[in-house]
Amino acid sequence: MASSSASSVPAPSGSVITIASASASAAANTAACGTGSPCAACKFLRRKCQPDCVFAPYFPPDNPQKFVHVHRVFGASNVTKLLNELHPYQREDAVNSLAYEADMRLRDPVYGCVAIISILQRNLRQLQQDLARAKFELSKYQQAAAAAAAASASTGTNNGPHSMAEFIGNAVPNGAQSFINVGHSAALASVGGAAACFGQEQQFSAVHMLSRSYEGEPIARLGGNGGYEFGYSTSMAGGGHMSGLGALGGAPFLKSGIAGSDERQGAGQ
């Protein structure tokens, strides 16, 4: 049993024209012709319907108005010629198109189906515009996503060396500190002593300049902590307001000398 389906086409007046599918109408018309009932075309033309009638599959006897409209607009001979030039699987669509156009032509003899064609073309243009707008919006989102991906990639590339430098900067001092605390305490002590000597030398230079301003004879001795201690020679005792300093701690002093100048024997032995 053939399946039946139909399609509806709007008309300008507001009515709907229903067009049956090819399989359903052809099967029904073939069954009607098999019972001896002529098709609508042969009945309208008042002729005997033959088994090989070209109109029988497409113009059933229960819908005579379909052939009447087609015959009035296009003519039976023109329709017969057109159907004979087409393949059998194309004839059903051709007959439905002729029937629809003939019905619209009878409703509007001037424009026919032009109004429906204009409506369909306008709908097609609207859909094309909507599609183009949707593609444009989609392209903007795609460009934004690509820009964000590129920015994140560049950020990751720039942060790579910086992160490595931070890792090295955080790791090396801890390791160096542990290394010094465990195995290099002696080296650390020597470095501290050198720094202390450097500080004492700066202090000694400052005091040396101060003592020269008082026209005294500056002498220095090597202290127990590895630095210099400042004092005045015992020969300066009673020789001015600076004579009260005397020798520092009663220890022997080393007289500071200057290259190219005469040394005076004033240090206590």
From Swiss-Prot:
The terms describing its cellular component in GO are: nucleus
Q: Where is the LOB domain?
A: 37-138
The record's subcellular locations are: Nucleus
Q: Show the Pfam families listed in the entry.
A: LOB
Keyword line: Developmental protein, Nucleus
Q: Any idea what job this protein has?
A: Negative regulator of cell proliferation in the adaxial side of leaves. Regulates the formation of a symmetric lamina and the establishment of venation.
Protein name as annotated: LOB domain-containing protein 6
Q: Which organism is it from?
A: Oryza sativa subsp. indica (Rice)
- Lineage of this protein's species? Eukaryota, Viridiplantae, Streptophyta, Embryophyta, Tracheophyta
